[in-house]
């Protein structure tokens, strides 16, 4: 089974180097096969040259050209993917050191489910919090797992892809569309990835809440009262996360 690892980057050579290094332990496992797809937004910081010098290690394929933002870049990665499942590890995100044990289990899974695992959220200064994957019904409030810990069936990604209408929650919208189309969530035990906090979902919580509410109403068709309750719960959670990030 081939796993597609898709990395989106823009002017973050340090992050690309970090993500690349985390793939090494997977490559050492004989029964794991993967490709690394990097979509760079035309950076001028040496990212392209670094990738060229890797000479295709880890079945690397990449493009370096302007795009219309992170979700447009992710769609480019989907178009290039040839695996059964795909995981999005953007520049600076890394596989957990024990992720090989999790990845091995994928070859026994059917490609009509979204596989979820746990992730470590890095707030800096050694402060990390584990986010455990939740049951599939949690999609009616939010993603059941961190985006960096969801293995999407590539066949499903090629049908739906990321909707650029959703500025900060297109990952939630995509998972919701696939869920409504019959792709269930299946939780497997184990840590998949680690990633640093401080992205759009951490710093722009008001836009995140509004975007997520639109997903709930337009895609998941949840009742208005539930969408309102979810909005308040999300706002409280994201505010706490933002405060913790700023404190650390």
From Swiss-Prot:
Pfam families: Glycos_transf_2 (PF00535). InterPro entries: Colanic_acid_synth_WcaE (IPR024010), Glyco_trans_2-like (IPR001173), Nucleotide-diphossugar_trans (IPR029044). GO terms for biological process: colanic acid biosynthetic process; lipopolysaccharide biosynthetic process; slime layer polysaccharide biosynthetic process. Pathway: Slime biogenesis; slime polysaccharide biosynthesis. Keywords: Lipopolysaccharide biosynthesis, Transferase. One of its GO terms (molecular function) is fucosyltransferase activity. The keyword Zinc does not apply. This is Putative colanic acid biosynthesis glycosyl transferase WcaE. It comes from Escherichia coli (strain K12). The lineage of its organism: Bacteria, Pseudomonadati, Pseudomonadota, Gammaproteobacteria, Enterobacterales.
């Amino acid at each position: 089974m081939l796993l597609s690892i898709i990395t989106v980057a823009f002017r973050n050579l340090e992050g690309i180097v970090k993500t690349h290094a985390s793939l090494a332990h997977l490559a050492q496992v004989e029964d794991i096969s993967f490709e690394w797809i990097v979509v760079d937004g035309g950076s001028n910081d040496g990212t392209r040259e670094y990738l060229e010098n890797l000479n295709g290690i880890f079945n690397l394929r990449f493009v370096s050209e302007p795009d219309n933002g992170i979700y447009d870049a992710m769609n480019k990665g989907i178009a290039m993917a040839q695996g059964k499942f795909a995981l999005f590890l953007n520049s600076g995100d890394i596989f957990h050191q024990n992720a090989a044990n999790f990845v091995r289990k994928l070859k026994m899974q059917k490609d009509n489910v979204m596989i979820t695992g746990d992730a470590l959220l890095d707030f800096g200064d050694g402060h990390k919090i584990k986010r455990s994957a939740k049951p599939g019904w949690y999609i009616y409030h939010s993603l059941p797992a961190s985006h960096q810990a969801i293995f999407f069936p590539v066949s499903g990604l090629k049908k739906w892809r990321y909707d650029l209408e959703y500025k900060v929650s297109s990952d939630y919208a995509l998972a919701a569309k696939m869920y409504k189309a019959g792709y269930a969530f299946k939780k497997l035990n184990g840590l998949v990835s680690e990633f640093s906090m401080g992205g759009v979902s951490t710093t722009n919580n008001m836009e995140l809440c509004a975007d997520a509410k639109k997903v709930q109403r337009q895609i998941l068709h949840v009742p208005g009262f539930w969408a309102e309750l979810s909005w308040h719960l999300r706002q409280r959670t994201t505010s706490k996360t933002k405060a913790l990030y700023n404190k650390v």
